[in-house]
Amino acid sequence: MWSSVANLKENLNKIAHDVHDDDEDDDEDLTIYGSTNGGTDRRNSNGFRYSRSPMANGFESPVNPEIERYKAEINKLQKSESEIKALSVNYAALLKEKEDQISRLNQENGSLKQNLTSTNAALKESRLDLSRASNNNAIKGNGDHSPNRSQRSPTNWKNRNQMNNGIASKPNGTENDSESHKKEKEFAEMLEERTRSMASAQARELEKEREKSANLQILLQEERKQNETFKEELQSLRLDKEKTLMESNKVRRELDAKLAEIRQLQMKLNGGEQHAFGISRENLKEVNKALEKENNELKLKRSELEAALEASQKSTSRKLFPKSTEDLSRHLSSLDEEKAGTFPGKEDMEKSLQRLEKELEEARREKDKARQELKRLKQHLLEKETEESEKMDEDSRLIDELRQTNEYQRSQILGLEKALRQTMANQEEIKSSSDLEIRKSKGIIEDLNQKLANCLRTIDSKNVELLNLQTALGQYYAEIEAKEHFERELAVAKEDAMKLSARLKDVDEQLESSKKEKEEITSKVLHAENIAAEWKNRVSKVEDDNAKVRRVLEQSMTRLNRMSMDSDFLVDRRIVIKLLVTYFQRNHSREVLDLMVRMLGFSEEEKQRIGLAQQGAAGKGVVRGVLGFPGRLVGGILGGGGGSPDSHPNMASDNQSFADMWVEFLLKDAEERERREAEDAANKEQEKATVSSTQRPKYEQSDSEFSTVPLTSSNSNHRLSRLLT
C-alpha cells in the first residue's frame, strides 16, 4: 500500500518537473518571438519598398481584414484563458480530492496497523484463556477457578485425603496412590490431546491466514507489476505522441521553407505590374484554405490524442490505485472481523474464506476488464496512428505537388524575367507613387505593432497571473501545460497570419496580371466568335442556296413529268431550223434528211414519198457533226416524235440518256437564275459578290457544252407545236 502511494507521489513530482521545464522553454520561446518581432517588421518594411501597393493595383488595402483577424484572435485567446482558468480550478479541485484520498488512505493504513496489533494481542489473550479454561474444566468441570488453584488442586487433594484418613493402612494408601496416578496420567493425556488438537487447529488457521496474506501479497505484487506495465505503456504512448509532434513540426517546417521560397519568388516578381505566375487568386485562396483546414485537422487530432491520453491515464489511475486500496481495506477489515469472531466457531472462518475468494474473483474480473480496456485503447491508438500516417503520406504528396508547381513557376519566372527587363523603365514612375503608399503602410504597420505590443502585454500579465496560480497550487501545475500550448499556438497563428498577409499581397498582384491575360484572351475569343459568325452566315447562305436549288429541282421534275406526256409530239422550232439549214448547206445530204425523218417521226409512206427507205442506224454518227450534241442525246430527241412501233426499243435507251441530260440542263438553268439573283444582290453586299464571282466560271463551262443548240423549257416546246399546227 505504501509503495503504491509512493509511486503516486513520484509520478506527480515527475509531472510537476516536466511542467516547470516546459514553462521555462515557453518563456524562452516568448522572448525569442519578441526579439524576432522587430526583425520581421523591418523585413516587411524593406519588402514594401520593392512591392507595389494594393491601391495602385485597383484593390483595397487588406489592413481592415487583418485587424479584424487580430481582434478575433485576441477574443479567442481571452476565451481560451477563461477556459484555462476554469480548467485550473477544476484541476485544483481534483488535486484536493486526490490529497484527501491520500490522507484517507494513510488513516486507513494506520487503522489497519492498529487493528493488526489489536488482533495479535487478542489472539494471544484468547490462547491463554483457552489454556486456562481447559485446565479448569479438566479438574473441576467449572471455569470459575483460577489457574493457580487448578495447578495446586491435585497436591492439595492428596494431602487432605492423607490428613483425613489419619493412620491408614499401607495397602490402601498404595492403591489410592496408584489410582490417583492413573487418573492424573489420564487427565494429563486428555489435556495433552486437547492442547495438541487446539494447537493443530490454531496452527492450521494460522497457516490459512498466512496463505491468505501470501496470496494478498502476490496479488499486490501482480498489481504493482501491472501498474509498472501501465506506466511503461503510458511512456510509450507519450513517446509516440512526441514522435507525431516531431513529424508534424517537420511538415510545418517544410511548408514554411516552401512558403519562404514562394515569397522570394514573389518578391522578385513584385516589380512587374502586368505579369503573373499563371495561377489565379481563387486557386491560391483554395490552397490556403486547404492548408488551414489541414492545420486545423492536425490540431484537432493532437487535442484528441491528448484527451485520449489523459482519459487513459485517469482511467488507469482510477482503476489501479483507488480500487486496489479499497479492496485491501475491505480485505483487511474482513480479516479483522473474521479474526475477532473465528475462534468461537469454524463456520465463521469458512464464511470469511468464501467471502475472500469471492472478492478475489471480483478483483480478477476487474483486472480482466482493465486489461480489455487497455487492449481497446491500444487498438484505438494504433488506428489513430495509422490514420495519421496516411494523412502524413497525403501531406507528403501535397508537398511533392507543391514542389512541382514551384519548379514550374521557376521555369515561368525565367521567361518572365526577360519581360521584366523591358518594364524596368516604367518602374521609376511607379516608385514615386509606391513611396507614398509605403509611408502609409508603415504607419499602419506601426499601429498594428502597437496593438501587438498591447496584446503581448496582456498575455504577459496573464502569464503572471498563471504563475501566481502555480505558486498557490504548488507542485500540481498541469493547467499551465494547456496555457503554454495555447501560447505556442498563438505564436504559430501570428506567424501564419503574417504569412497569409504576404500571400494575399502576392495574390493581388497575380490577380492583376491574370485579369490582363483574361482580357487578351477574351479579345481573341471575340475575334474568333466574329469569324465563326461570318462562317455561319456563309453556311446559312449556302444552305439557303441549296434549298432554292432543291425547290427548282422539284419544280423542274414536276415540269418534266408534265412535259413527258406531250414530249412525244413536240420538237423545238430551233432544232428544225437548224436541221433545214444544215440540209441545204450540205447539198441535200441524205444523213441530214434521215435525221429529220427520225426527228419528226415520218411514217413509211412519207419516207417512200421522199425517197428514203428504212435504214437501221444511219443517222447516229452524223448527229455530233450537225448539232454539236452527243449521239445518244440527239438520237433520243429525234426518236421522241416517232409513232411507229418498230422504233420503240431504240428509243427507250435514247430517251433514258436524254432524260439524264435534260435533268442536268434544268439544274444548270436553275443555277443561271440563282446567279442572276446573286448578281443583283452583289450590288448591295460585297461578300455575296465574291461568292458569285467564284461561281461564274463554273456556270460558263457548263453552258459551253450546249452552245451550239440552246434548248429551252416548255415555252419553246409550245411554240414549236404552234408552228407545226
From Swiss-Prot:
Residues 324-349, 672-688 have a biased composition (Basic and acidic residues). It comes from the Eukaryota. Its main location: Golgi. Residues 562-613 form the GRIP domain. Residues 66-132, 191-316, 344-407, 437-563 form a coiled coil. It is found in: Golgi apparatus. Keywords: Coiled coil, Golgi apparatus. Residues 711-725 have a biased composition (Low complexity). GO terms for biological process: Golgi organization. Residues 21-30 have a biased composition (Acidic residues). Residues 148-175 have a biased composition (Polar residues). Residues 17-62, 134-183, 191-210, 311-349, 672-725 are annotated as: Disordered. One of its GO terms (cellular component) is Golgi apparatus. PANTHER family: MYOSIN HEAVY CHAIN - RELATED, THYROID RECEPTOR-INTERACTING PROTEIN 11. The C-terminal domain (556-725) is necessary and sufficient for Golgi targeting. Golgi matrix protein playing a role in tethering of vesicles to Golgi membranes and in maintaining the overall structure of the Golgi apparatus. This is Golgin candidate 4.
